[in-house]
Amino acid sequence: MESLGLQTVRLSDGTTAYVQQAVKGEKLLEGQVIQLEDGTTAYIHQVTIQKESFSFEDGQPVQLEDGSMAYIHHTPKEGCDPSALEAVQLEDGSTAYIHHPVPVPSDSAILAVQTEAGLEDLAAEDEEGFGTDTVVALEQYASKVLHDSPASHNGKGQQVGDRAFRCGYKGCGRLYTTAHHLKVHERAHTGDRPYRCDFPSCGKAFATGYGLKSHVRTHTGEKPYKCPEELCSKAFKTSGDLQKHVRTHTGERPFRCPFEGCGRSFTTSNIRKVHVRTHTGERPYTCPEPHCGRGFTSATNYKNHVRIHTGEKPYVCTVPGCGKRFTEYSSLYKHHVVHTHCKPYTCSSCGKTYRQTSTLAMHKRSAHGELEATEESEQALYEQQQLEAASAAEESPPPKPTHIAYLSEVKEESSAIPTQVAMVTEEDGPPQVALITQDGTQQVSLSPEDLQALGSAISVVTQHGSTTLTIPGHHEELATSGTHTVTMVSADGTQTQPVTIITSGALVTEDSSVASLHHQQVALLATANGTHIAVQLEDQQTLEEAISVATAAMQQGAVTLETTESGC
């Protein structure tokens, strides 16, 4: 601790103020009477306060301006190459020593002593939390990698990278090299966020000083980390964000899915974490809006969805004369394309260039069949779907009269309410098929447009959801009318019971109750356990086209047609 002398002024109302001497060397005496600018009288008293020295752990990692990592020490580290040491002066005037893992030019400078250097991913993950299934999957994968990787040692025989500090919270067990980093991590469990933003009307709190420092840049607009790519002009608030962005140019995907047989890899650990939830089924974020209740795998998608209900548009285009507002950052990011002609993203297959990673990813999917996930592309796709849904809801005309023709009745032993499969037709609209309870309170419906996207998949609609089956490659032999039997394959790759397929032809007679429905062609798919799938054929001529609009599950037995009072 060092002493810092200040002059205090006791005002006439009894309060105390501190003054800084204007003239170097001038001394104010104890008890001296002075007159302030407003004409009031004050008395001088000298006090001593303690100022804490700048503290850090010996060997703490720091980040240089060029993005490389080094280590800070109170004294020169023994046995170090002198060319790898650099003396620096800290903010409190004291001297520390920087040890570079490799020699660097003498003009390198320390950007900042970051107590939480390298923890920006942790800070981002803190906002979303960890589900038990997700943590277990990633921990098992990390343990396997650590077990399979050969340990490296330095010249003294001490194991490099040995992690001695383990998190004691149940279901976690993460390891850290220092007690400080463990303490920072534990805030993810305790919810402790000691670093608070002091900007007016903000007040957000963070678990790390680095997180607060990065957040403050959202207020100041500072983006000190610029992309080194020649044709890219992007800049970022943190070195971690820059590192993630650079991977969109290099194609590096260091974060691999731990589930066996998946093999997908991602540019960030956060995208991987969200992807893992597609395996575990975890959806920790639920919309609180009444009658909505949708669940989401990521906090970002959840927040973006909630804004559809609230109408909030916090992201504003800063280009002069524009001022458009958006519900999501990805939408603003996508909008910036209209203000620039730069195309820094190149397709590795054909060489075409694009302004955004999202359009590049869509090009790869459509033109080359490559399935590639980036944070920007997935968010842009999600945003597009949400905006289209919201727009459709706003612009949709009043509901048209609906006619319902019940095709059959399905009653399960566990259900007291019988369920009927119905053909639902809106006035002047295409027919839909729905699963509707007699009291009309539950309905699952699919339109032909929706079902076209299924391709060769059959969606069997039941009270408990949808089960998807795929055709194992008999399209050519099944393209003709008649009766055929094939073995279906479920989504997990297991074979199910044989399915009898009755395509349009003599088996659907004119006096059939099904064929009489608007005199349109209808095909039936009957499984061995008695489940029927009704396929309404409009202009479709092949089985593949018919199956793409497969619509509902029906109980074994004859299909009966009940008409409504409207005569449909």
From Swiss-Prot:
<comment type="function">
    <text>May be involved in transcriptional regulation.</text>
</comment>
<comment type="similarity">
    <text>Belongs to the krueppel C2H2-type zinc-finger protein family.</text>
</comment>
<feature type="region of interest" description="3 X 12 AA approximate repeats">
    <location>
        <begin position="34"/>
        <end position="99"/>
    </location>
</feature>
<protein>
    <recommendedName>
        <fullName>Zinc finger protein 76</fullName>
    </recommendedName>
</protein>
<feature type="repeat" description="2">
    <location>
        <begin position="62"/>
        <end position="73"/>
    </location>
</feature>
<keyword id="KW-0238">DNA-binding</keyword>
<keyword id="KW-0805">Transcription regulation</keyword>
<feature type="cross-link" description="Glycyl lysine isopeptide (Lys-Gly) (interchain with G-Cter in SUMO2)">
    <location>
        <position position="24"/>
    </location>
</feature>
<keyword id="KW-0832">Ubl conjugation</keyword>
<keyword id="KW-0539">Nucleus</keyword>
<dbReference type="GO" id="GO:0001228">
    <property type="term" value="F:DNA-binding transcription activator activity, RNA polymerase II-specific"/>
</dbReference>
<dbReference type="InterPro" id="IPR036236">
    <property type="entry name" value="Znf_C2H2_sf"/>
</dbReference>
<dbReference type="GO" id="GO:1990837">
    <property type="term" value="F:sequence-specific double-stranded DNA binding"/>
</dbReference>
<keyword id="KW-0863">Zinc-finger</keyword>
<keyword id="KW-0479">Metal-binding</keyword>
<feature type="zinc finger region" description="C2H2-type 2">
    <location>
        <begin position="195"/>
        <end position="219"/>
    </location>
</feature>
<keyword id="KW-1017">Isopeptide bond</keyword>
<feature type="zinc finger region" description="C2H2-type 1">
    <location>
        <begin position="165"/>
        <end position="189"/>
    </location>
</feature>
<keyword id="KW-0677">Repeat</keyword>
<keyword id="KW-0862">Zinc</keyword>
<feature type="zinc finger region" description="C2H2-type 6">
    <location>
        <begin position="315"/>
        <end position="339"/>
    </location>
</feature>
<feature type="repeat" description="1">
    <location>
        <begin position="34"/>
        <end position="45"/>
    </location>
</feature>
<feature type="zinc finger region" description="C2H2-type 4">
    <location>
        <begin position="255"/>
        <end position="279"/>
    </location>
</feature>
<feature type="region of interest" description="Disordered">
    <location>
        <begin position="365"/>
        <end position="402"/>
    </location>
</feature>
<feature type="repeat" description="3">
    <location>
        <begin position="88"/>
        <end position="99"/>
    </location>
</feature>
<feature type="zinc finger region" description="C2H2-type 7">
    <location>
        <begin position="345"/>
        <end position="368"/>
    </location>
</feature>
<feature type="zinc finger region" description="C2H2-type 5">
    <location>
        <begin position="285"/>
        <end position="309"/>
    </location>
</feature>
<feature type="compositionally biased region" description="Low complexity">
    <location>
        <begin position="379"/>
        <end position="395"/>
    </location>
</feature>
<dbReference type="InterPro" id="IPR013087">
    <property type="entry name" value="Znf_C2H2_type"/>
</dbReference>
<feature type="zinc finger region" description="C2H2-type 3">
    <location>
        <begin position="225"/>
        <end position="249"/>
    </location>
</feature>
<dbReference type="GO" id="GO:0008270">
    <property type="term" value="F:zinc ion binding"/>
</dbReference>
<dbReference type="GO" id="GO:0005634">
    <property type="term" value="C:nucleus"/>
</dbReference>
<dbReference type="Pfam" id="PF00096">
    <property type="entry name" value="zf-C2H2"/>
</dbReference>
<keyword id="KW-0804">Transcription</keyword>
